[in-house]
UniProtKB/Swiss-Prot annotation:
Residues 1-20 have a biased composition (Basic and acidic residues). GO terms for biological process: protein folding. This is Protein GrpE. GO terms for molecular function: adenyl-nucleotide exchange factor activity; protein homodimerization activity; protein-folding chaperone binding; unfolded protein binding. The keyword DNA repair does not apply. Residues 1-39 are annotated as: Disordered. It comes from Bacillus cereus (strain ATCC 10987 / NRS 248). Coiled coil: none annotated. Pfam families: GrpE (PF01025). The gene is grpE. GO terms for cellular component: cytoplasm.
Amino acid sequence: MEERNEQVVEEVKEEVKEAQVEEAVTSEDSEESVEEKSEAALLQEKVDELQAKLTETEGRMLRLQADFENYKRRVQMDKQAAEKYRAQSLVSDILPALDNFERAMQVEANDEQMKSLLQGMEMVYRQLLEAMTKEGVEAIEAVGKQFDPHEHQAVMQVEDSEFESNAVVEEFQKGYKLKDRVIRPSMVKVNQ
C-alpha cells in the first residue's frame, strides 16, 4: 500500500507539474497575445497617424496646386493687359500735343503762307490720329450723349431746353480711350 501511495503521490506530482507547465504555457500565450494586441494597437495608431498626415499633406498639395494655377492665370492676365495697354504712357504724353494741334488749326488763315502752314499741320495731325487709331486709341463722343462719369468729367452745369436732362451740352477738352480703358475723360458742360 505504501507503494501504491507513493505511486499516487508521484502521479499527483506529475499532474501538478503538467498543470503548472500548461499554466505557464497558457500564461506565456496570454502574455504574448497581450503583447501582440498592444503591438497591433500601436501599429494601428501609427497607421492612423500616417494616414492623417497623408490626408493633410494631400490637402495642402491640392491647395498649393490651386494657388499656383491661380498665380499662372493672374500672370497671364497681367501679361495680356501689359501688352494690350503698352501704348498708354506714350498716348498720355502725346494728347497735349494733339490738343495744341487742334487749337492751332482753328486759327484763321489770312494769307497763302498761313494756309499752307495750316495744311501741313492738318496732315501731321491726321497722321498722328491714324497712328493712334492703329494702337486702339479713339476719341470719346460727348456732345449730345448722356453724361457718363466713367468717360466724362463735368466741369459746369447749365439749363438748356434743347438738350435732355443729364446730357452733355459742350465739350471743353476731348477725352480718349485706349481699347476699353479711359486714358483721359472728356471735360464737359452738362445739362441739368
